[in-house]
Amino acid sequence: PLGNPGGTFCGLVRLPVKGRDILIYSNCDTPGGNRENVTVWASFDGAQTWPIKRSVYKPVSAYSSLTAGRPGTASEGTICILFEGGKAFRHEGAFAASFNLSWVLGGERTGDGEVPKWVATK
């Protein structure tokens, strides 16, 4: 996303929603490129804009990876993130979290585009 100082320790996944181009991006979101505050951003237009983001883990952290559940399975609609983190050192351990798009939509607006009405009204 525009202005993200996080570098390349990120994850990216396209959600398997027929007829929609929804991307979820993960990275650290701190000034100066510090490795803290693992955050996910959502794009609804193929990465042209990233109008919403939500913090997953605020302490020190590092590399992250994303995956999305498969249609027609129990995992459908689930987004999973695996990332490095810790209380004092970013490589203390590996952490995992799962959430859905509705959870991301509860985050903060970035000012980079708008959340489409077809998403906001669901």
Locations of regions flagged by a protein language model:
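Asp-box/BNR beta-propeller blade signature and adjacent active/binding-site loops
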Residues: 1-122
